[in-house]
Amino acid sequence: MEKLTVIKVGGKIVEEESTLKQLLERFSKIEGKKVLVHGGGRSATAIATKLGIESKMVDGRRITDAETLKVVTMVYAGLVNKNIVASLQALGLNALGLTGADLDYMRSDKRPVKEVDYGFVGDVKAVNASLLADLIGKGVVPVLAPLTHDGKGNMLNTNADTIAGEAAKALSRFFDVTLVYCFEKKGVLLDENDDDSVIPEITRPLFEEYVKKGIIQGGMIPKLENSFAAINAGVSKVVITKADELGKDSGTVIR
């Protein structure tokens, strides 16, 4: 199978122009076929504030009411996505920006209300992997925004890590897929205050041991759960690394 790299970027990397420029330059130099998935939550919060719309969060997750949905659609599908696409075009990549509604490549169900009503948030139910694979095969570099749709005319805010994981899993039918999560740390750390304490490789038993000991906690737990789900679904390798280490043999490998 031909190799494909699916890379997810978010946080400060997307928000700061100089950092994003450097990352996209590194991304453009990665050999073979590739897909970029981006976040943009901080930009959405900043624009919402300017518009007088309060951003509500529960455990780090955005509550997406009707007004907030308008903002995240504008910011993710417009401002952030198209800036990235234009930058990649300038670097010689034939990039195409997509939300799940575009070409109906990814559908979701609106998350049911349980303890918390997250509003217009989507849980992915279907990925048109053959469509994405066809685009990739023609030399297109998909740039995926963290938005899906329900097939009934409604856009849904969807976690970028989830978009990356679901796309990687679906595309593993067509390619030998490596999934890379880029963020501000060098990888999964033994000591969150020591950026050099990177755990080079994590297996499921080691993950469970580190969770019990409190070494791995917070937002890293769902990120690793998504990583193991991707491996179980056919993704060859998952890497968690720092953005400026992209393309290097570094970070934490999940097997």
Describe the function of each predicted region.
Residues 1-255:
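C-terminal catalytic "cap/lid" subdomain
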